[in-house]
Amino acid sequence: MKTILQLAGARLILGGGLLAAVVVAGCSDDPVAVDPVTTVQKTGSTDNQQTAAGTVVPRSPQVILFRASGAKAIGETVTFTVEGGGGTVDGAVAVTDTRGIATVREWTLGQIAAANFLKATANGLEVTFTATGIAGPATAVVATLGQEQTALVSTEVAIPPAVRVVDQFGNGVGGQTVLWQVLSGNGLVLGSGSTDSESDGLAQVLGWQLGPTPGQNVLEAAASGFPAVQFTATAIP
């Protein structure tokens, strides 16, 4: 039969073991578990940028992470995802540096001139960057309205010819001067023989009067540095 002293000693040993287990369980070598990331912020200079559609933004988007204690979060993973605009991202997964900052390698905007959005996610938290894609340099002039018309001699065609000045992706480029010139048929350009493209790239002549002789009439639209566009119309008696 165990003595009272032996039983008391066993209880003490058992109790000490439980106490040690509790102490060990309460301690952790993982700083993330006791001081998690609670804040994800954009760095101001990398948000709300503007650049030509289909090109890389000048400043790569960055976020800075903070822990619950207010300390900068080092070594945390941030995922960057394109949310709108059709662009692409290079370096979609980044790790925060000693400053708590994670930077995407490159963000290329979509080819359509429009708003673009990039989301950064870390520890279930997210922020969204916005960038605006605008038309790039003009590369071509294309006919949009008024091709292959027919009208009585010495009268105007029903639809005044129009062209669109576009960049390499087809976005309209404003502020480009278009010159209108009759090439054949002895017709007349009504209004000014020079028009500037609107913000959507559209440039339209006020009117085109065909010549006095039945047959084909040709009108040319040209902008400096690009192949000209020709419109044809048939004058009938």
Set out the residue ranges of the language-model regions.
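Sec-dependent bacterial lipoprotein signal peptides
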Residues: 1-25
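The feature marks long extracellular or luminal low-complexity segments
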Residues: 24-237
